[in-house]
């Protein structure tokens, strides 16, 4: 395809990761199924470069985001007699995140204006899917808004679609949007990453450059960085770099010495805030992870499963 014919929408937004493929599925049978919902500009089943055996997953890229939405709305999908799991693909860099594989229905929205009301959040986010609950967090004592909120959808795909977008404007102000994870989901992401570093990163052209020995789709694990928090976190989520600890209200542990102050208020001036800066909240961790019903905002730019048919990295401990 020439540049003049290339779709205008970014490729990353038009790409789906397809997990749980039958080992019998080929590029052709994958294409035959998913082209029912639009024009495919690329379709590939990822294979071991040596044995040519399917890795149990692949990617399809549509000509438009609208076609991607149509395919996702048609779930569940069955290819060659096997139910598969399509997810919006995330970039190689983003897929390195410890919990990139987790599917959640709740997002954290930080950096919202004090005069932001529920209808502002609903007006913006309802374009991504059906909203079930909107919670604007306030200080229990003073009632003052703390600068962040949670929005819960009825489908994880709404969350996946939101977090791969780099810019979000609510009530006339750029905000920080991330997946919101419960304490249990955080623990799951941590355990799936720990000790498996380097077992599943891959890159290179379409079929080559794979690392690791496990086959995705038959119990094999793929992972990115070992140890939740990686070198920045010293083994614990956040650590010195990405902490969302501290003592907030409502049983939530928000805080940290950077983008949240010790009372759990969002402090946009102190954060490494900006769509192109990775969105890490700088500063020390100021509290433990204890307590029930906690939600943590994960590092920015996660979407679920990551990768590209040309240069990709899959960073999860998900099993099919």
From Swiss-Prot:
GO biological process: mRNA splicing, via spliceosome
Signal peptide residue numbers: none
Stretches assigned to the RRM domain: 14-97, 105-184
Compositional bias annotation for Low complexity: 308-320
Top-level taxonomic group: Eukaryota
GO molecular function: RNA binding
Biased composition annotated in UniProt, kind: Gly residues: 197-218
InterPro entries hit by this protein: hnRNPA1/3_RRM2, HnRNPA1/A2_C, hnRNPA1_RRM1, Nucleotide-bd_a/b_plait_sf, RBD_domain_sf, RRM_dom
Chain residue ranges for the region called Disordered: 182-218, 271-320
Sorted UniProt keywords: Repeat, RNA-binding
A single cellular component GO annotation: catalytic step 2 spliceosome
PANTHER family recorded: HETEROGENEOUS NUCLEAR RIBONUCLEOPROTEIN A1-RELATED (PTHR48026:SF2), HOMOLOGOUS TO DROSOPHILA SQD (SQUID) PROTEIN (PTHR48026)
Name of the molecule in the record: Heterogeneous nuclear ribonucleoprotein A1-like 3
Organism name: Homo sapiens
Gene encoding the protein: HNRNPA1L3
């Amino acid at each position: 395809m020439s540049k003049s014919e290339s779709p205008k929408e970014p490729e990353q937004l038009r790409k789906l990761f397809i997990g749980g493929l039958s080992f019998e599925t080929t590029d052709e049978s994958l294409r035959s199924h998913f082209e029912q919902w639009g024009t495919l500009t690329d379709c590939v089943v990822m294979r071991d470069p040596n044995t040519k055996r399917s890795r149990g997953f692949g990617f399809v890229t549509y000509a438009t985001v609208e076609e991607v939405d149509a395919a996702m709305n048609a779930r569940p999908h069955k290819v060659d007699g096997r139910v598969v799991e399509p997810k919006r693909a995330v970039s190689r860099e983003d897929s390195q995140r410890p919990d990139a594989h987790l599917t959640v229905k709740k997002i954290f929205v930080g950096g919202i204006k004090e005069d932001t009301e529920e209808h502002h959040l609903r007006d913006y986010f309802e374009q991504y899917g059906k909203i079930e609950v909107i919670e604007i967090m306030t200080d229990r004592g003073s009632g003052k808004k703390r600068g962040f909120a949670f929005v819960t959808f009825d489908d994880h795909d709404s969350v996946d679609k939101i977090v791969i977008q780099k810019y979000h404007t609510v009530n006339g102000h750029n905000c920080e949007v991330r997946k919101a994870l419960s304490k249990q989901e955080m623990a799951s992401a941590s355990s799936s990453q720990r000790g498996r570093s380097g077992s599943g990163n891959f890159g290179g052209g379409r079929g080559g450059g794979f690392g690791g020995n496990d086959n995705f789709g038959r119990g094999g694990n793929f992972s990115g960085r070992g140890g939740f928090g990686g070198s920045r976190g010293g083994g614990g989520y956040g650590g010195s770099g990405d902490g969302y600890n501290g003592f907030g209200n409502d049983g939530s542990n928000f805080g940290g010495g950077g983008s949240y102050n010790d009372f759990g208020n969002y402090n946009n001036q102190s954060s490494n805030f900006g769509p192109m800066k990775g969105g890490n909240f700088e500063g020390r961790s100021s509290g433990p992870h204890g307590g029930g019903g906690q939600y943590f905002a994960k590092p920015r730019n996660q979407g679920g499963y990551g990768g590209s048919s040309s240069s990709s990295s899959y960073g999860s401990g998900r099993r099919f």
